[in-house]
């Protein structure tokens, strides 16, 4: 919820509150830049808290990360504006965004690791999809709050004080999440492996992950989902409103409806992956995004279509290119990595993919759309991200129901057993 609150704020109002002296296009690019700053911080947070999670446990790290994110999100709601303190306003905004990003870097990976290690074989996909459903619930809540603000407030009221309400209201979610995690038990897989006290169970050196085929495949899988998420949920909403002058209710209402439908899409994909494996659903969803990107975008940006038609097109591409892939992401990555490095490698692969694809994607989309004066770069980037996700899915091994206590990563060559030569028997 915290990141979606910010992403919609960056797309819809921050350009006027924190960058009012820039042109419309440049202000949107700068606002997307503050969005991207959080993704840079997420990599650092993924490394720090991922290593901690593999050493001291999943539970403690999840408590730390949710607290960091919640406090920063609430503080954004009390920031002074550019009109009040000038350039220090965006500086403070970026500072809070970076601290928020540090916690976010291990938040979803930690939750995904925890649920995967709790779930029994045969039900990991559906159970792990609860992480995506929780994130989707946050997206829905954030979108609903912003939509409500746009509905009840005038533009002047929204820019004067209304934009603060979504961030201040997040304190309720933070308190509940902290209470929930204080009462959480540690992952049984983590306890089992660490109780064994085996020398071979020590975490591998941090640099070794970059030699892992599983690490790069996971990063590629992340491109398809995270890149499309940044373009569709963040940039496209701002592009429709600021550049094409659409009613703000069109993208916010469409994303809200899409998030509601996601409560069917996400568990269905999780259940399906328990039946037919992780690879095939990944291949289907990425292929669908590639095929649908151009026709759906051509409808979304065309004002000659009815608002309902535009919203349907946005809902379709969002479910195929974002929510469907997110349903598969956490369990697939958890099963791809060995138990002693799972948290670290899952978090860093997700955040590297997120930084490159989603963190910088909206900025590049803004630049390319301004240069070309068209929506074509958005569709091309969605297809490109989905192609990377598709190739990664085709190359990855099937990891469904893999032993989560295994030390090695799934895509690595299995160690060969060298048998000692047997002495020949004398006749």
Swiss-Prot record:
Using the chain's own numbering, where are the disulfide bonds? none
The question of whether ATP-binding is a record keyword is answered with: no
Give the keywords, sorted. Answer: Cell inner membrane, Cell membrane, Membrane, Symport, Transmembrane, Transmembrane helix, Transport
Provide the coiled-coil residue spans: none
Q: What spans does the record annotate as topological domain Cytoplasmic, numbered to this chain?
A: 1-7, 50-74, 119-132, 179-225, 273-279, 329-351, 395-427
Topology of this chain in the membrane: Multi-pass membrane protein
Q: Which PROSITE patterns does the entry mention?
A: MFS
Where is it localised?
A: Cell inner membrane
Any idea which GO molecular function terms this record carries? potassium channel activity; symporter activity
**Chain segments annotated as transmembrane:** 8-28, 29-49, 75-95, 98-118, 133-153, 158-178, 226-246, 252-272, 280-300, 308-328, 352-372, 374-394
Residue ranges in the Periplasmic topological domain are 96-97, 154-157, 247-251, 301-307, 373
Q: One GO term of the cellular component aspect?
A: plasma membrane
Q: Which family does it belong to?
A: Belongs to the major facilitator superfamily. Metabolite:H+ Symporter (MHS) family (TC 2.A.1.6) family.
Query: What is the role of the protein in this entry?
Result: When overexpressed in human HEK-293 cells forms an inward rectifying potassium channel.
Q: Additional comments on file?
A: YdfJ may constitute the C-terminal portion of an ancestral gene disrupted by an insertion of the cryptic prophage Qin/Kim. The N-terminal fragment may be ynfP.
Record protein name field: Putative transporter YdfJ
């Amino acid at each position: 919820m915290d990141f979606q609150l910010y992403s919609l704020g960056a797309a819809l109002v921050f350009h006027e509150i924190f960058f009012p002296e820039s042109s419309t296009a440049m202000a949107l690019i700068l606002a997307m830049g503050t969005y991207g700053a959080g993704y840079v911080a997420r990599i650092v947070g993924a490394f720090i808290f991922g290593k901690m999670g593999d050493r001291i446990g999943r539970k403690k790290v999840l408590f730390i990360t949710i607290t960091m994110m919640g406090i920063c999100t609430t503080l954004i709601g009390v920031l002074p504006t550019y009109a009040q303190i000038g350039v220090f306003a965006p500086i403070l905004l970026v500072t809070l965004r970076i601290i928020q990003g540090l916690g976010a870097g291990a938040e979803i990976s930690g939750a995904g690791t925890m649920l995967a290690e709790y779930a029994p074989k045969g039900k990991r996909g559906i159970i792990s999809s609860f992480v995506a459903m929780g994130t989707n619930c946050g997206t829905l809540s954030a979108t609903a709050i912003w939509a409500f603000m746009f509905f009840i407030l005038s533009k002047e009221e929204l820019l004067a004080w209304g934009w603060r309400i979504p961030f201040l209201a997040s304190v309720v979610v933070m308190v509940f999440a902290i209470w929930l995690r204080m009462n959480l038990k540690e992952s049984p897989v983590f306890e089992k492996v660490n109780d064994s006290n085996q020398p071979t169970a020590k975490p591998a050196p941090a640099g070794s992950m970059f030699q892992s085929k599983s690490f790069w495949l996971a990063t590629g899988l992340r491109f398809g989902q995270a890149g499309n998420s940044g373009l569709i949920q963040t940039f496209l909403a701002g592009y429709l409103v600021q550049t094409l002058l659409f009613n703000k209710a069109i993208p916010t209402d469409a994303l809200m409806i899409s998030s509601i439908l996601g409560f069917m899409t996400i568990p269905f994909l999780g259940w399906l992956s328990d039946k037919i494996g992780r690879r095939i659903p990944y291949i289907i969803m990425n292929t669908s995004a590639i095929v649908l990107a151009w026709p759906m975008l051509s409808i979304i940006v065309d004002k000659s279509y009815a608002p309902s038609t535009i919203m349907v097109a946005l809902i379709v591409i969002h479910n195929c290119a974002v929510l469907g892939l997110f349903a598969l992401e956490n369990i697939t990555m958890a099963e791809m990595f060995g138990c002693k490095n799972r948290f670290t490698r899952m978090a860093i692969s997700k955040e590297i993919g997120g930084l490159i694809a989603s963190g910088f994607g909206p900025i590049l989309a803004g630049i390319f759309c301004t240069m070309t004066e068209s929506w074509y770069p958005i569709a091309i980037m969605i297809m490109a991200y989905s192609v990377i996700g598709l190739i990664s899915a085709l190359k990855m091994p099937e990891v469904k129901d893999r032993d989560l206590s295994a030390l090695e990563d799934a895509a690595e060559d299995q160690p060969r057993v060298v048998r000692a030569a047997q002495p020949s028997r004398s006749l």
